[in-house]
C-alpha cells in the first residue's frame, strides 16, 4: 500500500513540475472566439495568438459568411489593419501573420473582421 502511495505521489510531482514547462514553451497559445455582428448573425470566427521569446504569431479566421464568397474581408487587431483575405466558396477566410507583422497583443486587445465597405462581421477580445 505504501509503494502505491509513494508511486502516485511521485507521479503527481512529476506532472506538476512538467506542466508549467510545457505551457512556458508556447503550448497552444491563447485562442478566442470571434462573435457575430448584427449584420452577419450566422458568422463565427476564432483568433489564436502565440508568443515565444523573439517570435509572435497571430492567426484569425471567419466562417459562415457564404454570401461574401469571392469578396475580400479585412482583419484588424487593436484597431490596426493586420491584412486582408478573400472569402472562399464555402464562406470562410483565414489569415496568419508572424513577428513584425503582428502588433502587441495583451488582455483586452480586440480582433475584428470587416467587409471592404467597413461593415463588422465578427469581433472578440483576448
Give the residues covered by each predicted segment.
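N-terminal targeting/export leaders
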Residues: 2-7, 14-15, 19-126
Amino acid at each position: 500500500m505504501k509503494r502505491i502511495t509513494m508511486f502516485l505521489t511521485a507521479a503527481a510531482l512529476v506532472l506538476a513540475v512538467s506542466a508549467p514547462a510545457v505551457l512556458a514553451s508556447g503550448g497552444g497559445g491563447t485562442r478566442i472566439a470571434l462573435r457575430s455582428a448584427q449584420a452577419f448573425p450566422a458568422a463565427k470566427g476564432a483568433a489564436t495568438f502565440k508568443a515565444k521569446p523573439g517570435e509572435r504569431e497571430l492567426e484569425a479566421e471567419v466562417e459562415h459568411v457564404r454570401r461574401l464568397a469571392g469578396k475580400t474581408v479585412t482583419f484588424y487587431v487593436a484597431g490596426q489593419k493586420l491584412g486582408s483575405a478573400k472569402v472562399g466558396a464555402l464562406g470562410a477566410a483565414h489569415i496568419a501573420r508572424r513577428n513584425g507583422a503582428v502588433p502587441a497583443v495583451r488582455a483586452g486587445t480586440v480582433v475584428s473582421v470587416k467587409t471592404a465597405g467597413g461593415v463588422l462581421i465578427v469581433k472578440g477580445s483576448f
